[in-house]
Amino acid sequence: MKQKQYKLTSEGIAELKTELDMLISSRSELAERIKSAREFGDLSENAEYSSARQDQERAEIRIAEIENILNNSEVIKQPKKNDTVSLGNTVVLKDGKTEKTFTIVGSVEADPMEGKISNESPIGQALLGKKLGEKVEIKTPSATNTYTIKEIN
């Protein structure tokens, strides 16, 4: 089965590498917590031990996940300034008097609260390939809105 290719900005790769380094460096602390918790006796009723093991398991799962993403990622090249929306662009949309700004990134980096939307999201899909000044209809689960593309950076 073919591995999924993840699309990441260079900033996204740097953030993942920082998180990976932090998780790897926490391994010894987690091992020490498990060792200390074992000293409390019966492991079947030892909440500290169970908690430490769960934290260790979550960290190892996240380490494997990040390593997989980094090993199967493609860097989004900084798009040239042009009049067509592509992956990596920041787009300013206008709906009457309301303006919204989105940066189109790969799904791993998506963070709607920070204005980073996935190229796989309804908004991302609606914007990709559209041109400056073009009207775009964006369908989301809650509504359908029409925006004009005011800026592409």
Placement of each model-derived feature along the sequence:
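N-terminal cationic and glycine-rich segments that engage phosphates or anionic surfaces
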Residues: 2-54, 58-61
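Non-DNA-binding regulatory cores of transcription-related proteins
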Residues: 76-153
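Internal alpha/beta loop-helix hairpins
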Residues: 56-79, 83
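Conserved NTP-handling cores and scaffolds of large molecular machines
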Residues: 24-27, 70-74, 131
